[in-house]
């Protein structure tokens, strides 16, 4: 552990661009350079993974093309080496959680000031857990950052002391405008998991994972943390941050639902989320077809089916599953790219009139079976 931290600090102290970009890295080392006007990590070695930032695609990837899904280059201050994926399996797990949380919007960051001293709760509920022996509060005179609003509550980040931050809820919606969309993903916590109200500095354990029930992910905070809600042993509600690496999705494949939608489908209306024409095979393999502009405009594939000018795309091969649904849907559809390790998750529904619908956030598209 000390060796990894020392290697990180040593790399951080190097002059920007001092290391050779293609030079092999050892576990725990990084390269730092300027990206879009800020210091960011351009290469990270973690366990068996060496991830290099590609400005053209705005992603991190291994030499053989495995992508780690993040929102662009990691700024210098956000990297948390102890929470990095260290194996291919862990990276794929992070990508799956990233896809599962796409219904949720990001956090805001708006500075707020004032004169009030406000009680701070761990959830937007007067009966939820309250830190500091039930006395946690924030003085707006000292400054705070508004992260989101939920009903008539506001989530704020503030400094407790020089080595401790806290993120919690205050019962007011007058601090600014920070609307968000939250999701609701049931998960299981792995051994050693914990929830914290300080994901940036102290990682103070508000609760240990094995003391929590009904854990559900609400949003992704950054590449290393998810925002979650849970219930404590005494029934108290608790919201906080959990490391992505300590979360396991509770997905169960629905073989009957997969059998019901196997076949070839063509786009017929709404948002074109899944490509124009694709085939879902019963073994979980799938393929998208490259079709001509004329076929796109006329949608003749809906009556003629696959014709000579509609060829399977080698880059359009994918794996697919149907699992239990989230956010009120009966089923979710997971599309996985086996070549780069990324995946996309949609809510899915087979309508009474035979259309297959895919939905994500506020977008949706419909497909019909084709000959």
Each language-model region and where it sits:
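Bacterial N-terminal signal peptides
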Residues: 9-15
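Edge beta-strand at a domain terminus
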Residues: 79, 83, 169, 244-255, ...
């Amino acid at each position: 552990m000390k060796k990894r931290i020392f290697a990180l600090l040593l790399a951080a102290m190097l002059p920007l661009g001092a290391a050779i970009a293609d030079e092999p890295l050892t576990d725990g080392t990084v390269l730092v350079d300027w990206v879009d006007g800020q210091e960011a990590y351009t290469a990270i070695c973690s366990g068996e993974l060496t991830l290099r930032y590609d400005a053209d695609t705005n992603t991190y990837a291994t030499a053989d093309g495995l992508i780690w899904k993040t929102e662009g280059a990691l700024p210098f201050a956000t990297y948390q080496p102890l929470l990095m994926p260290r194996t291919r399996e862990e990276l794929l797990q992070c990508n799956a959680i990233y896809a599962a949380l796409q219904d949720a919007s990001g956090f805001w960051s708006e500075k707020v000031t004032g004169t009030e001293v406000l009680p701070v709760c761990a959830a937007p509920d007067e009966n939820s857990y309250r830190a500091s022996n039930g006395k946690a509060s924030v003085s707006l005179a000292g400054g705070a950052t508004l992260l989101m609003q939920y009903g008539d509550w506001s989530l704020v980040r503030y400094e407790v002391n020089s080595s401790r931050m806290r993120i919690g809820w205050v019962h007011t919606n007058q601090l600014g405008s920070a609307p968000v969309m939250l999701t609701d993903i049931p998960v299981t916590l792995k051994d050693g998991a914990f929830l914290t109200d300080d994901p940036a500095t102290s990682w103070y354990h508000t609760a240990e994972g094995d003391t929590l029930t009904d854990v559900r992910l609400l949003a992704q905070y950054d590449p290393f943390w998810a925002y979650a809600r849970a219930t404590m042993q005494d029934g108290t509600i608790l919201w906080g941050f959990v490391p992505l690496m300590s979360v396991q999705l509770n997905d169960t494949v629905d073989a009957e639902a997969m059998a019901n939608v196997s076949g070839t489908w063509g786009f017929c209306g709404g948002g074109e989320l899944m490509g124009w024409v694709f085939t879902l095979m019963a073994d979980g393999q799938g393929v998208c077809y490259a079709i001509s502009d004329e076929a796109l405009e006329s949608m003749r594939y809906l009556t003629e089916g696959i014709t000579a000018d509609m060829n399977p795309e080698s880059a359009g091969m994918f794996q697919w599953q149907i699992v239990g649904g989230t956010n009120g849907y009966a089923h979710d559809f997971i599309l996985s790219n086996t070549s780069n390790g990324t995946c996309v998750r949609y809510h899915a529904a087979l309508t009474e009139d035979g259309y297959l619908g895919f939905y994500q956030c506020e977008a949706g598209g419909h497909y019909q079976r084709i000959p």
